[in-house]
């Protein structure tokens, strides 16, 4: 006769059913979306800046002649640096988008990737912000001029060129904000993984 005081093994196993999987956070999908937006913003800023070109017939002061003068992005080293930096940011954006997708598929390596993301995001933020500031400084002088050193405005003549440059800088500022958000999200995600 079997004792009724001891529970059988099958009932113990059924009572110790595995806990439901914890609800998966949306951080991974937000990472993917923000990184893709970084890629799109960087490429857009580069394309808009590269297409910044305009030719105008400008009168020569003191002479009764007019000559065609061209304004293009390649005339300024700051704009060339801007193109280079945002191109690197675009490449970084697509590579980290693919890495973030791999984290969604295999979350085992998430902490290691998040640490690298946080460090590289700060580095990219510095590069993009410095390039945006350099291009913005040149664009501001083109828009307002500088009477102290007798640099005249050029945006009153090359309006389409200045609109392209201004739009490109605005999109680059958006990319900088995205990098700030990505840095904060990566650090917060790492913080949440610290055992309490």
Swiss-Prot record:
Coarse class of the protein's main subcellular location: membrane
Presence of keyword Membrane: yes
Source domain of life = Eukaryota
Membrane topology listed for this record: Multi-pass membrane protein
Q: Does the keyword Transmembrane helix apply?
A: yes
Q: Name one Pfam family in it.
A: CASP_dom
For the Cytoplasmic compartment, the record's topological domain ranges are 1-29, 106-112, 189-196
**Entry's localization field:** Cell membrane
Q: InterPro entries, from UniProt? A: CASP/CASPL, CASP_dom, CASPL
Region span, Disordered: 1-22
Give the stretches traversing the membrane.
Answer: 30-50, 85-105, 113-133, 168-188
Q: Which residues lie on this side of the membrane: Extracellular?
A: 51-84, 134-167
Question: Where are the compositionally biased (Basic and acidic residues) regions?
Answer: 1-18
Similarity annotation: Belongs to the Casparian strip membrane proteins (CASP) family.
Write down the PANTHER family for this protein, in alphabetical order.
CASP-LIKE PROTEIN 1U1
Quaternary data:
Homodimer and heterodimers.
Checking NCBIfam families in the record gives: A_tha_TIGR01569 (TIGR01569)
Protein name (Swiss-Prot/TrEMBL): CASP-like protein 1D1
Species assigned in the record: Populus trichocarpa
